[in-house]
Amino acid sequence: KSRQSIKRYKTIFEWIKLMWPFDCGLDSVELRRVLVVYSAALAPIILSLYLIYKNKMEKWISLTLISTFLIAAFGWELWINYGVLNGQEVNLRRSEALSCAIPMNINWIVNSLGDTGIVWFGIILVGWIFRNSENFDKFYWSVFLVLFVWFMFQNILVEMVIYHHQVGGNTLLSWAPMMPFCSWFNPKLQVIGDRTVALQTQSAWIIGSFVFYYVSIYFHRTIKKKI
């Protein structure tokens, strides 16, 4: 049994070692990128575990976050990760070092977790600005506007800085349910130098702004009725 345990631990260690960014030959820019991506993915998990431990995690938020992860994963992350329909898989749009640091088969999970954290921060931001418990009782344009501005701001930042070489330029992204125009209709706005913002990559969060707000409203009202 002890030999089996040692073998199991060795296997786990080797798996972790393969994923560890420092073993992948990343340059300094890529390393910072990888650390930001993993930090963004781990943040909602760590915060959720902490709030659950403190018994302060609201059920409607838990359900909203789980739904957000699934919507992001099946709405666009899986599609553009594997280049399902008329697109390049992610490994063709980035360096070998990045493909090593964030393997393709977990890349969509990491990004979907990051998307979940973005939505959660949006909910927190709304609560901080309006400071009342009725923000998610029904649709309010003021609340939607805050969410929309936040979602679009972060996504433009991601497209221009973190994932510029993966989703910008001449990269070919797959069609996805929440990126319906694909490359067939994809006007681009040149912002700084060669950095562009494209309709295809922004459409996920344009549509998502409505979807995630309505999901939040649904679970908030449903849980509130049961109390």
Residue map of PLM features:
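Cationic, low-complexity basic patches in intrinsically disordered or flexible, solvent-exposed regions
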Residues: S5
